[in-house]
Amino acid sequence: MAIRKSQVYLSTVNSYLIDSPQPSTINYWYNTGSLTGLCLVIQIASGIFTAMHYSSHIDLAFASVEHIMRDVNYGYLIRYIHANGASFFFVCMYGHIGKALYYGSYKSPRVLVWVIGVIIFITTMATAFTGYCCVYGQMSHWGATVITNTLSAIPFIGNDLVPFIWGSFSVSNPTIQRFFALHYLCPFILAALVVMHLMALHVHGSTNPLGISSNIDRLPFHGYFVFKDLVTVFVFLLIFSTFVFFSPNTLGHPDNYIPGNPLVTPASIVPEWYTLPFYAILRSIPDKLGGVIAMFGSILITLVLPVTDRSVIKGNTFKIFSKTLYFTFTYNFILLGQLGQLHVEVPFIEMGQIATFNYFTYFIVLVPLVSTLENILFYIGRVTTK
């Protein structure tokens, strides 16, 4: 027997990365998972080297970032890789989530994979938020102030919870230091969650675009899908390198090159682009508590999909109504992202409220309604063809 199969640790690697049977019909959208894993490795590696030269003291945080950029050998490269890596991490993650929504990867028997994936997404958002605050530029300070202040809407404990998180009566030195500690810790929690995600996936294997059982036609992972993944890895590295070397600040905000000043409020407080859809949902609800519930609910509501999607056919490949609904939802999500960076004024307020209503309607009403309708049409078609 080959050593990769007989040795305890190598046999585990073999079962996941070499002999793992994969559906022969999976397409390039399934590569977003491996790209997201690559981004996590890049972020952990670049983050460790950045942390070697970073100071989390509020008086030194901004200066230490400039020190990394100007004085550390290749510090500018490490910092730009880490900053742009965060954006590309979310690009790949949103693509991975979009693939799962389109191909029905959340349906039984892969519900656990989906639930762990949602937990990974929430943890990633927390990691990104705490990291964004560590720079302590003007947008970092006010972003931290606004987002943490939303927790004051929680009944009974909200007003005590916010100073507890800050460690003071405002965003100050204890806040930045504890945010940095959490930011350093969270990626390793993410890595553990990713391992759990892969373990849950390994039980039943990947889905496929056809939405049918692929047990009769599978191929080993190594040799076929390793090289298929490498194609998108090289394309990803090409695009990623273009941003890092030629346009490193495109995905950032210019106000964050101004040191954080609690006495000067920016013209508009805009978080990082990957949080904008949820920020738009937060702003669309006039009531503060309602906005906070809607923002967190917009992520947690994805957990109901395995229940609300009643379709007997996995995925949207052969379902025209679900496919149309999916692309409408995608457009609505992008619209929320655009509205999140605009000023709170007419007509953007009303547009945000309509887009927020459409977002929740998709999960609660449209998915069960359309999937039930398609089931009826499917059964009618099956009876008439007999």
Curated annotation (Swiss-Prot):
Cofactor(s) annotated in UniProt: heme b
The entry's keywords: Electron transport, Heme, Iron, Membrane, Metal-binding, Mitochondrion, Mitochondrion inner membrane, Respiratory chain, Transmembrane, Transmembrane helix, Transport, Ubiquinone
Residues where heme b b562 binds: 82, 183
InterPro entries tied to this protein: Cyt_b/b6_C, Cyt_b/b6_C_sf, Cyt_b/b6_N, Cytb/b6-like_sf, Cytochrome_b, Cytochrome_b_C_euk/bac, Cytochrome_b_N_euk/bac, Di-haem_cyt_TM
The name this protein goes by in its record: Cytochrome b
Source organism, top-level taxon: Eukaryota
UniProt topology in membrane: Multi-pass membrane protein
One GO cellular component term noted in the UniProt record for this chain: mitochondrial inner membrane
Family membership: Belongs to the cytochrome b family.
A Pfam family recorded for this sequence: Cytochrom_B_C
Gene3D superfamilies xref list: Cytochrome Bc1 Complex, Chain C
Species name: Wickerhamomyces pijperi
GO BP field: mitochondrial electron transport, ubiquinol to cytochrome c
Regions that span the bilayer: 32-52, 76-98, 113-133, 179-199, 225-245, 289-309, 321-341, 348-368
Positions of heme b b566 binding: 96, 197
Compartmental location: Mitochondrion inner membrane
Residues that, per the record, bind a ubiquinone: 202
Oligomer status and interactors: Fungal cytochrome b-c1 complex contains 10 subunits; 3 respiratory subunits, 2 core proteins and 5 low-molecular weight proteins. Cytochrome b-c1 complex is a homodimer.
Phylogenetic classification of the source organism: Eukaryota, Fungi, Dikarya, Ascomycota, Saccharomycotina
Misc. remarks from the entry: Heme 1 (or BL or b562) is low-potential and absorbs at about 562 nm, and heme 2 (or BH or b566) is high-potential and absorbs at about 566 nm.
